[in-house]
Amino acid sequence: YKILKGLVYRALFFCMNIIHRGIANKKLKENCFKSFKESFNKKYGIETDIHFTKDNKIICFHDFTLNRLFKINKSIKNLTYDEIKSNTKLKISVPLLKDVLKLSKKRYLVLIEIKPILNLRNIKILLNEIKNYKNCIIISFKHTNLFKIRKINKKVKIGFSFAKNSKILDIIKTSSKKNYDCLILDKYFINNKSIQNIKKNKYFYTVKEKKEFLKYSKKNNLIFENL
């Protein structure tokens, strides 16, 4: 049983293509409950972003403010979850991470990107929230978040994120660290031999064209959108 269980979890993290912020189209908005549900229904994993509200609720939302999606110039960190719901209820619902995790049914990979730099208290809240979900990987461009996590928890899955302007030597140096699970890399690096030779699971973002998806998806883990 343990062997079979291990194989199931291994399958979650290999040859996997992930939908960026859930399915988004004319009917569905990014990082909303319905977009995640539709993604899971199509048997895809998801990537989502998280922020903490003023009352320490973890929400799935990309931006630091409500301005881009809702034309409301207010910061997430300065609003309670009820205030966010009140401000956005006529457009889309901003989901709690715990509800999205339940929706995944522990079957589909969930990449959880920490957007801000978190304090230790919030790190502990996040770890407690995901403790029963082995289908999660916590990722961040702000690597200090991941170092804090490792000091508290040696087993939770983590991944270092890198932008297009990252130096290859920095990526390789980070990849030599122990006790992490994957790298999240801009697709700019997908044809780089030094990067491909790194013996760690890698996810390349963000693929937006079907032709590009078909070209690379057989041999790479891709984070894609709107295909």
What residues fall within each predicted segment?
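Phosphate-group recognition and catalysis centered on beta-loop-alpha active-site segments
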Residues: 4-227
